[in-house]
């Protein structure tokens, strides 16, 4: 079953369900990609920092292109610029490394992964002696200008942002000659992001939800935190529609035209996650799921300082999550 699409302002069609690859182990991700492509996925979400683009490239090389199972023009591939590569001189080399690893001539979408820059170099998490991150003063508006040059060169079809606040999006729009097409953020019924989605849609950006199932596999999970997949309303709808709780959460998103990139390396789940286009919730059922919102953000980069877990970047002037949305 192919996923339905949204139309980006660039004219590109972006499938509403893609395969996420964050936390997909090398050794597993190649088979996951190949399986996903055989069951109808046409959207793969990648990032340099995930450390698995080389293996994803092997899967794409075997499956995508002239005379192979999937024509390149049918596939939508996203990747992301890491924080150590924000300096304008580093942007194109970073993209070219991603393209080489993925064995692609162009990306359909390239996102700035976070608004703030880390110190330049090959260490992805440069640190001070006390364990805090070493930042770089490059502003995302300057990085954006360097990203725009990649579109002019035909290396990237569309640009976007990840983990930016509404204010930061407007800041980019104020200098952009190539407008961002997509914002990727954490989003699920506990963090519905209604204001941010409305903000984006009013400005011609589509929204992609990462961790759409609540990321229960994250390393720092607090055992006392609520579990989205176990919510009674989710369970009740799963029973009513004879679906899994995951399918209920994904259907809620695609029904509000939010793109989802659930990660899995398990074939049965990969298949299940795309089977969300043959049932529809009533407006009342959508409201029941909307009511789960508690602005609960799970994905906040953390550090251990003096034995305590603290948000790694919260003191940075460009930290996005200090803004209301």
Curated annotation (Swiss-Prot):
- Record-listed N6-succinyllysine modification sites: 127, 145
Instruction: List, from the UniProt record, the residues annotated as the active site of this protein.
Output: 50 (proton donor)
InterPro entries named in the record: AKR, AKR1A, Aldo/ket_reductase_CS, NADP_OxRdtase_dom, NADP_OxRdtase_dom_sf
Record has NADP as a keyword: yes
Known EC number(s)?
1.1.1.2, 1.1.1.372, 1.1.1.54, 1.1.1.19
Q: Where on the chain is Phosphoserine found, per UniProt? A: 4, 211
The cross-references to SUPFAM superfamilies, in alphabetical order and at most eight, read:
NAD(P)-linked oxidoreductase
Q: Name one GO cellular component term.
A: cytosol
Carrying N6-acetyllysine, the residues are 127
Q: N-acetylalanine (modified residue): where?
A: 2
Catalysed reactions listed for this entry: a primary alcohol + NADP(+) = an aldehyde + NADPH + H(+); glycerol + NADP(+) = D-glyceraldehyde + NADPH + H(+); glycerol + NADP(+) = L-glyceraldehyde + NADPH + H(+); L-gulonate + NADP(+) = aldehydo-D-glucuronate + NADPH + H(+)
Residues noted as binding NADP(+) in the record, renumbered to the chain: 11-22, 45, 162-163, 211, 213, 215-216, 263-266, 269, 272-273
Checking PROSITE patterns in the record gives: ALDOKETO_REDUCTASE_1, ALDOKETO_REDUCTASE_2, ALDOKETO_REDUCTASE_3
Give the Gene Ontology MF terms in alphabetical order: aldose reductase (NADPH) activity; allyl-alcohol dehydrogenase activity; glucuronolactone reductase activity; glycerol dehydrogenase (NADP+) activity; L-glucuronate reductase activity; methylglyoxal reductase (NADPH) (acetol producing) activity; S-nitrosoglutathione reductase (NADPH) activity
Which key words tag this protein in UniProt?
Acetylation, Cell membrane, Cytoplasm, Lipid metabolism, Membrane, NADP, Oxidoreductase, Phosphoprotein
Looking at the keywords, is Ubl conjugation present?
no
Q: Which domain of life is it from?
A: Eukaryota
Site (Lowers pKa of active site Tyr) location in chain: 80
Similarity section: Belongs to the aldo/keto reductase family.
Q: What does this protein do?
A: Catalyzes the NADPH-dependent reduction of a wide variety of carbonyl-containing compounds to their corresponding alcohols. Displays enzymatic activity towards endogenous metabolites such as aromatic and aliphatic aldehydes, ketones, monosaccharides and bile acids, with a preference for negatively charged substrates, such as glucuronate and succinic semialdehyde. Plays an important role in ascorbic acid biosynthesis by catalyzing the reduction of D-glucuronic acid and D-glucurono-gamma-lactone. Functions as a detoxifiying enzyme by reducing a range of toxic aldehydes.
Quaternary structure and partners: Monomer.
Protein name per UniProt: Aldo-keto reductase family 1 member A1
Q: Which gene encodes it?
A: AKR1A1
């Amino acid at each position: 079953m192919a996923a339905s699409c949204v139309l980006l302002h660039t004219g590109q069609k972006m499938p509403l369900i893609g395969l996420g690859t964050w936390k997909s182990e090398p050794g597993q991700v190649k088979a996951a990609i190949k399986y996903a492509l055989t069951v109808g996925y046409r959207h793969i979400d990648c990032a340099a920092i995930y450390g698995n683009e080389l293996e994803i490239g092997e899967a794409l090389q075997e499956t995508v292109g002239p005379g192979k199972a999937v024509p390149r023009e049918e596939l939508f591939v996203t990747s992301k610029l890491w924080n150590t590569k924000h300096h304008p001189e580093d942007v194109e080399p970073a993209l070219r490394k991603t393209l080489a690893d993925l064995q692609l001539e162009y990306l359909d979408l390239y996102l700035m992964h976070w608004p703030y820059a880390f110190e330049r170099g090959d260490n992805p998490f440069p640190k001070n002696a006390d364990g805090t991150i070493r930042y770089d003063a490059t502003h995302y508006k300057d990085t954006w200008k360097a990203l725009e040059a990649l579109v002019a060169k035909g290396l990237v079809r569309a640009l976007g942002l990840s983990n930016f606040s509404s204010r930061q999006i407007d800041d980019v729009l104020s200098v952009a000659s190539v407008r961002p097409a997509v914002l990727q953020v954490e989003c699920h019924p506990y963090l519905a992001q209604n204001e941010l989605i409305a903000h984006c849609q009013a400005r011609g950006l589509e929204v992609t939800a990462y961790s759409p199932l609540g990321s229960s596999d994250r390393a720092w999970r607090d055992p006392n935190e609520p579990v989205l997949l176990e919510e009674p309303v989710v369970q009740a709808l799963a029973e009513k529609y004879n679906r899994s709780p995951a399918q209920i959460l994904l259907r809620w998103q695609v029904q509000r035209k939010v793109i989802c990139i659930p990660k899995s390396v398990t074939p049965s789940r990969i298949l299940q996650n795309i089977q969300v286009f043959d049932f529809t919730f009533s407006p009342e059922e959508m409201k029941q799921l909307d009511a789960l919102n508690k602005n609960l953000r799970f994905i906040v980069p953390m550090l251990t300082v003096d034995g305590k877990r603290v948000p790694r970047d919260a003191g940075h002037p460009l930290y996005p999550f200090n803004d209301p949305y």
